[in-house]
A protein has these predicted regions:
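Alpha-helical scaffold segments that mediate packing/assembly in large oligomeric complexes
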Residues: 1-34, 76-77, 82, 160, ...
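Extended alpha-helical or coil "stalk/linker/tether" regions that are enriched in polar/charged
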Residues: 13, 19-71, 91-95
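Sequence/fold signature of self-assembling virion shell proteins
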Residues: 58-168
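Long, contiguous amphipathic alpha-helices that act as assembly "spine/axial" helices in icosahedral shell
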Residues: 1-9, 33-49, 81, 131-154
Protein backbone atom coordinates (compact mmCIF):
# COMPACT_ATOMS: atom_id res chain seq x y z
CA UNK A 1 0.00 0.00 0.00
CA UNK A 2 2.92 2.31 0.71
CA UNK A 3 3.60 3.00 -2.95
CA UNK A 4 -0.07 3.36 -3.90
CA UNK A 5 -0.59 6.37 -1.63
CA UNK A 6 -0.94 9.83 -3.14
CA UNK A 7 2.10 11.99 -2.37
CA UNK A 8 -0.04 14.43 -0.36
CA UNK A 9 -1.09 11.56 1.93
CA UNK A 10 2.47 10.56 2.86
CA UNK A 11 3.48 12.68 5.84
CA UNK A 12 6.10 12.60 8.59
CA UNK A 13 5.13 11.78 12.18
CA UNK A 14 4.64 14.76 14.49
CA UNK A 15 6.63 13.26 17.39
CA UNK A 16 6.34 10.90 20.33
CA UNK A 17 4.08 12.60 22.88
CA UNK A 18 0.42 11.67 23.31
CA UNK A 19 -0.55 14.95 21.62
CA UNK A 20 1.79 14.20 18.71
CA UNK A 21 0.27 10.74 18.32
CA UNK A 22 -3.23 12.24 18.26
CA UNK A 23 -2.03 14.72 15.63
CA UNK A 24 -0.66 11.82 13.56
CA UNK A 25 -4.06 10.11 13.60
CA UNK A 26 -5.86 13.37 12.84
CA UNK A 27 -3.55 14.11 9.90
CA UNK A 28 -4.19 10.68 8.42
CA UNK A 29 -7.95 10.88 8.83
CA UNK A 30 -8.00 14.40 7.39
CA UNK A 31 -5.92 13.26 4.43
CA UNK A 32 -8.50 10.66 3.44
CA UNK A 33 -11.64 12.59 4.30
CA UNK A 34 -10.41 15.81 2.64
CA UNK A 35 -9.92 13.80 -0.55
CA UNK A 36 -13.55 12.63 -0.44
CA UNK A 37 -12.59 9.04 0.31
CA UNK A 38 -15.82 7.19 1.05
CA UNK A 39 -14.55 5.63 4.33
CA UNK A 40 -16.74 2.56 3.85
CA UNK A 41 -14.25 0.03 5.24
CA UNK A 42 -11.27 1.93 6.66
CA UNK A 43 -8.58 0.05 8.55
CA UNK A 44 -5.30 0.82 10.30
CA UNK A 45 -2.10 -1.17 9.74
CA UNK A 46 0.89 -1.03 12.08
CA UNK A 47 3.87 -2.93 13.45
CA UNK A 48 3.28 -4.82 16.75
CA UNK A 49 5.59 -2.46 18.66
CA UNK A 50 3.37 0.49 17.76
CA UNK A 51 0.21 -1.36 18.79
CA UNK A 52 1.79 -2.38 22.09
CA UNK A 53 2.76 1.23 22.75
CA UNK A 54 -0.81 2.41 22.14
CA UNK A 55 -2.42 -0.24 24.36
CA UNK A 56 -0.25 0.85 27.29
CA UNK A 57 -0.41 4.62 26.73
CA UNK A 58 -1.96 6.46 29.70
CA UNK A 59 -3.08 10.00 30.39
CA UNK A 60 -1.87 12.10 33.34
CA UNK A 61 -4.52 10.44 35.58
CA UNK A 62 -3.33 6.93 34.76
CA UNK A 63 -6.30 6.11 32.50
CA UNK A 64 -5.72 4.18 29.30
CA UNK A 65 -5.91 6.52 26.32
CA UNK A 66 -6.78 3.77 23.83
CA UNK A 67 -8.59 1.02 25.78
CA UNK A 68 -10.29 -0.12 22.55
CA UNK A 69 -6.85 -1.26 21.33
CA UNK A 70 -6.83 -4.06 23.90
CA UNK A 71 -8.32 -7.43 23.09
CA UNK A 72 -8.48 -9.81 20.16
CA UNK A 73 -9.98 -7.25 17.75
CA UNK A 74 -8.26 -3.90 18.38
CA UNK A 75 -10.01 -0.76 17.18
CA UNK A 76 -8.78 2.81 16.75
CA UNK A 77 -11.27 5.62 16.06
CA UNK A 78 -13.88 2.86 15.53
CA UNK A 79 -11.82 1.32 12.71
CA UNK A 80 -10.14 -2.12 12.93
CA UNK A 81 -6.41 -2.32 13.51
CA UNK A 82 -4.34 -4.97 11.75
CA UNK A 83 -0.89 -5.76 13.09
CA UNK A 84 1.89 -7.10 10.90
CA UNK A 85 5.66 -7.44 10.98
CA UNK A 86 5.59 -6.80 7.21
CA UNK A 87 5.70 -3.13 8.15
CA UNK A 88 9.36 -2.52 9.07
CA UNK A 89 10.41 -1.10 12.43
CA UNK A 90 14.03 -0.38 11.52
CA UNK A 91 13.61 2.67 9.28
CA UNK A 92 15.06 6.17 9.68
CA UNK A 93 17.27 6.24 12.75
CA UNK A 94 16.99 2.45 12.98
CA UNK A 95 13.85 2.20 15.10
CA UNK A 96 11.30 4.18 13.08
CA UNK A 97 8.26 2.57 11.49
CA UNK A 98 5.27 3.52 9.36
CA UNK A 99 1.55 3.67 10.04
CA UNK A 100 -1.12 3.11 7.39
CA UNK A 101 -4.78 4.05 7.14
CA UNK A 102 -6.66 2.83 4.08
CA UNK A 103 -10.24 2.47 2.93
CA UNK A 104 -10.08 -1.21 2.06
CA UNK A 105 -13.20 -1.00 -0.10
CA UNK A 106 -10.81 0.47 -2.71
CA UNK A 107 -8.25 -2.33 -2.36
CA UNK A 108 -8.16 -4.85 -5.20
CA UNK A 109 -6.36 -8.19 -5.21
CA UNK A 110 -5.92 -9.75 -8.64
CA UNK A 111 -5.17 -13.41 -9.12
CA UNK A 112 -4.53 -15.19 -12.41
CA UNK A 113 -6.66 -18.29 -12.83
CA UNK A 114 -3.85 -20.37 -14.28
CA UNK A 115 -1.14 -22.10 -12.29
CA UNK A 116 2.11 -22.64 -14.18
CA UNK A 117 3.65 -26.01 -13.29
CA UNK A 118 7.07 -27.09 -14.57
CA UNK A 119 9.04 -30.30 -13.99
CA UNK A 120 12.75 -30.65 -14.78
CA UNK A 121 15.14 -33.53 -14.10
CA UNK A 122 18.23 -31.58 -15.16
CA UNK A 123 17.81 -28.49 -12.97
CA UNK A 124 19.98 -27.57 -9.99
CA UNK A 125 19.25 -26.13 -6.56
CA UNK A 126 21.15 -24.97 -3.49
CA UNK A 127 20.94 -27.01 -0.31
CA UNK A 128 22.94 -25.95 2.77
CA UNK A 129 25.04 -23.61 0.59
CA UNK A 130 25.97 -26.50 -1.74
CA UNK A 131 24.82 -26.68 -5.36
CA UNK A 132 22.90 -29.91 -6.00
CA UNK A 133 22.16 -31.38 -9.43
CA UNK A 134 18.76 -33.05 -9.82
CA UNK A 135 20.17 -35.13 -12.69
CA UNK A 136 23.08 -36.60 -10.72
CA UNK A 137 20.83 -37.26 -7.71
CA UNK A 138 18.13 -38.89 -9.86
CA UNK A 139 15.58 -36.28 -8.79
CA UNK A 140 12.90 -34.32 -10.60
CA UNK A 141 12.30 -30.75 -9.50
CA UNK A 142 8.79 -29.33 -9.66
CA UNK A 143 7.94 -25.64 -9.72
CA UNK A 144 4.49 -24.08 -9.40
CA UNK A 145 3.95 -20.38 -10.08
CA UNK A 146 0.79 -18.50 -9.15
CA UNK A 147 0.41 -14.87 -10.21
CA UNK A 148 -1.06 -12.24 -7.87
CA UNK A 149 -1.21 -8.47 -7.79
CA UNK A 150 -2.49 -5.73 -5.50
CA UNK A 151 -3.68 -2.22 -6.26
CA UNK A 152 -5.78 0.58 -4.85
CA UNK A 153 -8.58 1.94 -7.04
CA UNK A 154 -7.86 5.45 -5.79
CA UNK A 155 -4.44 6.63 -4.59
CA UNK A 156 -6.17 9.02 -2.20
CA UNK A 157 -7.64 6.04 -0.29
CA UNK A 158 -4.31 5.41 1.48
CA UNK A 159 -2.57 7.56 4.07
CA UNK A 160 0.95 6.80 5.30
CA UNK A 161 2.68 8.28 8.32
CA UNK A 162 6.47 7.88 8.08
CA UNK A 163 9.16 8.33 10.73
CA UNK A 164 6.92 6.89 13.45
CA UNK A 165 9.24 6.77 16.48
CA UNK A 166 6.65 6.30 19.22
CA UNK A 167 6.68 2.77 20.55
CA UNK A 168 10.25 2.14 19.42
Amino acid sequence: MRHWAAAANITISNGTTSTDIEDDFKDMLNGLESSDVRMIRPAWFMHPTRKNHLINLRDSNGNLIYPEMRGANPMLYTFPVFVTTSIPNNLGAGTDSELYLADMVDAVIGEATDLAIDADASASYVENAVMQSAFSRDETLIRAIARHDFAMRHRESVSVKTGVAWGA
